[in-house]
From Swiss-Prot:
HAMAP family assigned to the protein according to its UniProt record, in alphabetical order: Asna1_Get3
PANTHER family: ARSENICAL PUMP-DRIVING ATPASE ARSENITE-TRANSLOCATING ATPASE, ATPASE GET3
One term of GO molecular function: ATP hydrolysis activity
Protein name: ATPase ASNA1 homolog
Origin species: Entamoeba dispar (strain ATCC PRA-260 / SAW760)
Sorted UniProt keywords: ATP-binding, Cytoplasm, Endoplasmic reticulum, Hydrolase, Metal-binding, Nucleotide-binding, Transport, Zinc
Binding residue positions for Zn(2+): C274, C277
Length: 327
């Protein structure tokens, strides 16, 4: 019988190949505390590395976790010079991309072209998660240009940021439509922006989408390479978080994304004398047993409920000891 993996994240902390680490889970399970404390730990243990934490969760709790106000540009964390944090709004990243197309008027009677373009854009925007997918492409490009050695993502609740892996296939479909439109309407494409009252140059749409496709294909290649990327689910020992975590892990595996570590957070101590806590701990024990069986091949890190708020660099440093090997 094979031994279970160590109950720590040393393989991530000491990795010389990892470039991207995702931390995700149901809201309220402690994923932001996990991502921030892990970022502090990796930066402190690897002073030669430039580490960046990117929050893509609309709640942006990273500012609260560090007790520092962060924004859309990377900001260094005082006391941890090789760690920076930024908070990205995916809605801002998508803003204006297709503005005006669906609302375009048809004053010159170009019903055929208007219908084709509006239908194409409408279909493109209706793809679930397409805004996050394109925003991720922009975010990844930005992070790559900054030359960080490791990027940790504090993601939106369970699964929301995984849809970007479908972006290449969506873009390929859209490119086929753009090519078809150019073949059908030819020179009219360059005049269409004036017809519907928008500044979009549809002759530039094809090369832009080709560039986006090339970028997204490389991102997917990197994100499905276990030497470069891993995903860490965070949960608490209750039914819904466990159910959603199992669904998330199955989705990750179907997308060929590596997941080998799980954080089980907010565990109540066994010897708590409060009746409510005893009953709560009894429920937790049931799900902890299921977690042990389901994820015996994973690095399982179990963390007790914290008696104090985890806020600020010193508190994050203290919390991060849960991820290290015990000596």
């Amino acid at each position: 019988m094979s031994l279970s993996p160590p109950n720590n994240l040393e393989h991530i902390i000491t990795s010389q190949t990892l470039k991207w680490v995702f931390v995700g889970g149901k809201g309220g399970v402690g994923k932001t505390t996990t991502s921030c404390s892990l970022g502090v730990l990796i930066a402190n243990r690897n002073p030669q590395k430039k580490v960046l934490i990117i929050s893509t969760d609309p709640a942006h709790n990273t500012s609260d976790a560090f007790d520092i106000k962060f924004g859309a540009e990377p900001k260094a964390v005082p006391g941890v010079p090789n760690l920076s944090v930024m908070e990205v709004d995916v809605k801002d990243a998508m803003k204006g991309m297709f503005d005006g197309v669906e609302q375009g008027t048809n004053q010159n009677g170009e019903f055929g072209l208007l219908s084709e373009i509006t239908g194409m854009v409408g279909m493109f925007k209706s793809v679930p998660g397409i805004d996050e997918a394109i925003a991720f492409s922009k975010i990844i490009n930005q992070a790559q240009q900054m030359n960080y050695d490791l990027v940790l993502f504090d993601t939106a609740p369970t699964g929301h940021t995984l849809r970007f892996l479908s972006l290449p296939s969506v873009l390929r479909d859209m490119l086929e439509k753009v090519i078809k439109l150019q073949e059908l309407f030819g020179p009219m494409m360059s005049q269409f922006g004036g017809i519907i009252g928008t500044n979009i140059n549809f002759n530039e749409l094809k090369p832009k989408m080709e560039d986006m496709l090339k970028t997204s294909e490389q991102i997917v290649k990197d994100f499905t390479n276990p030497n470069l990327t891993t995903f860490i689910p965070v949960l608490i020992p209750e039914f819904l978080p466990l159910y959603e975590t199992e669904r998330l892990i199955q989705e990750l595996m179907n997308l060929n994304m590596d997941v080998n570590s799980i954080i089980v957070n907010q565990i109540l101590p066994v010897n708590d004398c409060c009746d409510y806590c005893k009953n709560k701990r009894s429920v937790q024990a049931k799900y902890l047993g299921q977690i042990d069986v389901l994820y015996s091949d994973f690095h399982l890190i179990k963390i007790n409920m914290q008696t104090n708020e985890v806020r600020g660099v010193p508190a994050l440093c203290a919390f991060s000891k849960n991820f290290e090997a015990k000596h």
